[in-house]
Amino acid sequence: LQARQQTVSALEDKIADYKRRMADAVSRKKMDTKPTDPTGIEPDDHLKERSSLRYGNVLDVNAIDIEEPSGQTADWYTIGVYVIGFTLPIILKALYMLSTRGRQTVKENKGTRIRFKDDTSFEDINGIRRPKHLYVSMPTAQSTMKAEELTPGRFRTIVCGLFPTQIQVRNIMSPVMGVIGFSFFVKDWADRIREFMEKECPFIKPEVKPGTPAQEAEFLKRNKVYFMQRQDVLDKNHVADIDKLIDYAASGDPTSPDNIESPNAPWVFACAPDRCPPTCIYVAGMAELGAFFSILQDMRNTIMASKTVGTAEEKLKKKSSFYQSYLRRTQSMGIQLDQRIILLYMLEWGKEMVDH
């Protein structure tokens, strides 16, 4: 029955589409037969006299889905499977072109769908080698992206989440991360995060039973314990699609970190993805680490905003865009960020990073 209903609704949609096309064709014919207005006003314009502006492009909104206005969520599983199907060299070279040289690549190819080609990436069809292109769409502000379409932002997000170790080895980094001192920050990550985990956490008030050894009572106040609690919360909030992607990635080469203390953990953000990559969104503290980096980018923009006039506060208002959009995009993937962890990072490393 369901299948029949679907067929019927599909046919109804088709009929409606044909009716619309016929109406368009009829109205177009009418337009063609109308004599042109000597004043240069378009026949269906409601103004009596011509506007001082010339007529611009016709924006076609047929493709826009009004039911989903709040920013599109990507189909991460399909995107992940597509990217994992390529050889590592072409993925990393494309990442280099879209992060280190990103500005230039995007500027030169705006509004088109580009193909990356590399000799390592080919497919055999009946014994004939054919290049296997990696397609990336370079949208303008107006274009609507399909859920499984790769854009520079989505590409950086998925590749950073899948291959942080390879990015670390080759030291591929976004210019903006270089400016906020990322390489200095990750130089001794293992020691840095270990010290952080052993610090006392201001947000925990452990119920220490009388007679508990002092050492254990002290351990219960550490940041590590707060992160364990956060991990429990995250474990209950999984989205099926992202789980599927993580399982698929685990069966291949990818090296996504399973713990914030992994040596490659901060490298997930080396190419400044605009959200937390889906492969490590359920690792306690990872999404918040990305938010910490985006705050640093905003602070750097505030300090560097020499072109804008006004007080530092006004500049801050203008510039807090990275952090806001990072939060919005990451939370659209189905998790809430823990602001307290971001605060812990700021208290621990904020001053050091800004001074650096």
UniProtKB/Swiss-Prot annotation:
Region Interaction with host UBE2I/UBC9, as annotated, extends over 145-148
Where does it live in the cell? Answer: Virion; Host cytoplasm, Host perinuclear region; Host Golgi apparatus, Host cis-Golgi network
Give GO cellular component annotations, separated by semicolons.
host cell Golgi apparatus; host cell perinuclear region of cytoplasm; viral nucleocapsid
Annotated region described as Disordered, given as residue ranges: 26-46
Query: Keyword annotations for this protein?
Result: Chaperone, Coiled coil, Endonuclease, Host cytoplasm, Host Golgi apparatus, Hydrolase, Nuclease, RNA-binding, Viral nucleoprotein, Virion
Here the segments flagged for biased composition (Basic and acidic residues) are 26-35
Q: What domain of life is recorded for the organism?
A: Viruses
Enumerate the residues marked as the site Important for the endonuclease activity.
45, 60
Task: Name the Enzyme Commission number(s) assigned to this protein.
Answer: 3.1.-.-
Q: Where is this region: Interaction with glycoprotein N?
A: 37-205
Q: According to the UniProt record, where is the region Homomultimerization?
A: 57-82
User: What are the boundaries of the region Interaction with host RPS19?
Assistant: 107-132
Q: Kindly list any coiled-coil regions of this protein.
A: 1-28
For this UniProt entry, what is the primary localization, expressed as one broad class? virion
Annotated spans, Viral RNA-binding? 132-174
Query: A GO molecular function for this record?
Result: endonuclease activity
Positions of short motif YxxL? 135-138
Q: What does this protein do?
A: Encapsidates the genome protecting it from nucleases. The encapsidated genomic RNA is termed the nucleocapsid (NC) and serves as template for transcription and replication. The nucleocapsid has a left-handed helical structure. As a trimer, specifically binds and acts as a chaperone to unwind the panhandle structure formed by the viral RNA (vRNA) termini. Involved in the transcription and replication initiation of vRNA by mediating primer annealing. Plays a role in cap snatching by sequestering capped RNAs in P bodies for use by the viral RdRp during transcription initiation.
Question: Regarding domains, what does the record say?
Answer: The N-terminus is required for chaperone activity and, in trimeric form, this region likely serves in high affinity vRNA panhandle recognition. The N-terminus also contains a coiled coil region, which probably participates in but is insufficient to initiate N trimerization. The YxxL motif is indispensable for the interaction with host MAP1LC3B. The central region is involved in specific RNA-binding. Has distinct cap- and RNA-binding sites so it can bind simultaneously both the vRNA and mRNA cap.
Subunit arrangement?
Homotrimer. Homomultimer. Homomultimerizes and binds to viral genomic RNA to form the nucleocapsid. Interacts with host MAP1LC3B; this interaction participates to the protection of Gn from virus-triggered autophagy. Interacts with host SNAP29; this interaction participates to the protection of glycoprotein N from virus-triggered autophagy. Interacts (via N-terminus) with host RPS19; this interaction probably mediates the loading of the 40S ribosomal subunit on viral capped mRNA during N-mediated translation initiation. Interacts with the viral RdRp. Interacts with host SUMO1 (via N-terminus).
Family designation: Belongs to the hantavirus nucleocapsid protein family.
Q: What is this protein called?
A: Nucleoprotein
Write down the species. Puumala virus (strain Berkel)
Q: Lineage, please?
A: Viruses, Riboviria, Orthornavirae, Negarnaviricota, Polyploviricotina
Give me the gene this protein comes from: N
